[in-house]
Amino acid sequence: MLIGVVSRLTDQKGFDLIAYKLEELCQSGGCQIVVLGTGEEQYENLFRHYSWKYPEILSAQITYSNEMSHKIYAACDAFLMPSAFEPCGLSQIISMKYGTLPIVRETGGLKDTVIPYNQYTGEGYGFSFANYNADEMLGCIYSAMDVYYNNKPAWLQLQKQAMAADYSWDVSAEKYIDLYSTVTGIARPKKVVKAPVKPKKSEFEKHIREDFEASEKAIVESAKEPEIIEVKNPFPEPEKKTKTTTKKKTTKKK
């Protein structure tokens, strides 16, 4: 399983938890990790070291590239985001649109947007852990790996559900309207869906008859022999020159 990390490398994003369990995760043999980002020097050096120590397990790009970030979102199977706090978070939403399942800590916007997988009902489109604890994070990663390797149909269904999740303003606006309606006690006006007006039978028959008559007329017109039109030369013909001949008088000799 390929796990992606696209983030600022800071404590707020939970990299102290990752640092604590990175050695164990690299030795687990069940995943590969790709990291993209810049931040605190200690974490930049941490990923440089592990990409040198486990070159076939971990790849670290200590930079930021929007183009590369989208390639990571698209290529990975899971996306790790163990933030200490997260007011909203966009990376988990972007990853879901690519069918990459987020592994997150239940805080702020991560808790609001990532519904954890329920093995009994099949609901959800991600994996989450509650406490800011490295062991819980690792256990959550292992749970995701178990589904990925041992229950492919469930994993594929989670991907479909993740890609179908809608966090657009259309949905948010509807929720705000419902909230204001509840607070104020003013009922929302019901949406009036107008059914398409069907033409009356008489009008429908009239249109059919007109179309039929028009097609009949076109057939008759096309069957007529073409009219031969004499085309006159618009330019006058040049006048013919007449030759004048003179008769010579001859005298007979006597």
What do these predicted regions represent?
Residues 29-71:
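Nucleotide-activated donor-binding/catalytic signature segment of Leloir-type glycosyltransferases, i.e.
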Residues 243-246, 250-251:
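Low-complexity, polybasic segments enriched for Lys interleaved with small residues
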Residues 66, 71-166:
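Catalytic binding pocket for nucleotide-activated donors in carbohydrate/polymer assembly enzymes
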Residues 1-12:
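Conserved donor-binding/catalytic core segment of Leloir-type glycosyltransferases
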Residues 124-234:
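C-terminal amphipathic helix plus adjacent low-complexity
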Residues 8, 36-38, 63, 105, ...:
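Cofactor-binding loop segments of dinucleotide-utilizing enzymes, especially the Rossmann-like FAD-
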Residues 10-23:
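A conserved mid-protein helix/loop that constitutes part of the nucleotide-sugar donor-binding site
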